[in-house]
UniProtKB/Swiss-Prot annotation:
Belongs to the mycobacterial HigB family. This is Putative toxin HigB2. It comes from Mycobacterium tuberculosis (strain ATCC 25618 / H37Rv). The keyword Transit peptide does not apply. The gene is higB2. Keywords: Toxin-antitoxin system. Putative toxic component of a type II toxin-antitoxin (TA) system. Its cognate antitoxin would be HigA2. Induction: Induced in persister cells in response to D-cycloserine. Transmembrane segments: none annotated. InterPro entries: HigB-like.
Length: 201
């Protein structure tokens, strides 16, 4: 994860982190032993960009970048299965276990996970739309369309068995997944801190 650094002076380092990364980084930092005392203050700039002021000694400044970047990279990914919960509840036990085994791997690996478990979807208007391909029972071909959002969540959007309906299945599911993810992103933007306009002095 690329963490842009602003400046350092007076024995403290100031780091500027994008809003979608800040909450996860801030939460992780305070959960790590020995890190709580390193953070003196956290606040938001007027434009909504969060800044963290860290009290690492001056001599550690060259190391802080890699240390904080490592903390950011170690923040886990999570899967949001709310939109496919009805489908999940209708699965037989073996298929259910195979699906959740695949989801657990996805949460561990994040966007780095590739074939054969994850593949890119063609025809979606979202460049990061992918499909999860868990193991299947018999002749079934289970697929789950998902996309990662800025909050490090894999949003599970549409799922089903595409066996025997290869092209038709994608035509139907991708369209639905596109709409759901667009709606999710819009809601995500609405919850972000609004940029304040500076008053003319």
């Amino acid at each position: 994860m690329n963490v842009p650094w602003e400046n350092a002076h007076g024995g403290a380092l100031y780091c500027l982190i994008r809003g979608d990364e800040f909450s996860a980084w801030h939460r992780l930092l305070f959960q790590r032993p020995g890190c709580a005392e390193s953070v003196l203050a956290c606040r938001h700039f007027l434009d909504g960009s969060p800044v963290a002021r860290c009290s690492y000694p001056e001599e550690y400044h060259p190391c802080v970048i890699s240390r904080i970047a490592l903390l950011c990279d170690s923040v886990g990914w999570t899967a949001d299965v709310e939109r496919i919960s009805a489908w999940l509840n209708g699965l037989d036990r073996e298929t259910y276990e195979l699906v959740f085994a695949a989801i657990e791997v996805l949460e561990e690996e994040g966007p780095a996970l590739g074939c054969p478990l994850v593949d890119t979807v063609r025809g979606s208007r979202h460049k990061n739309m992918k499909e999860l391909r868990p193991g299947s029972q018999g002749r079934s071909e289970v697929r789950i369309l998902f996309a990662f959002d800025p909050a490090r969540q894999a949003i599970m959007l549409a799922a089903g068995n595409k066996a025997g309906r290869w092209t038709q299945w994608y035509d139907e599911k991708i369209k639905a997944a596109d709409e759901m993810f667009a709606e999710h992103l819009a809601q995500f933007e609405d919850t972000k801190p609004k940029r304040r306009k500076r008053k003319k002095g």
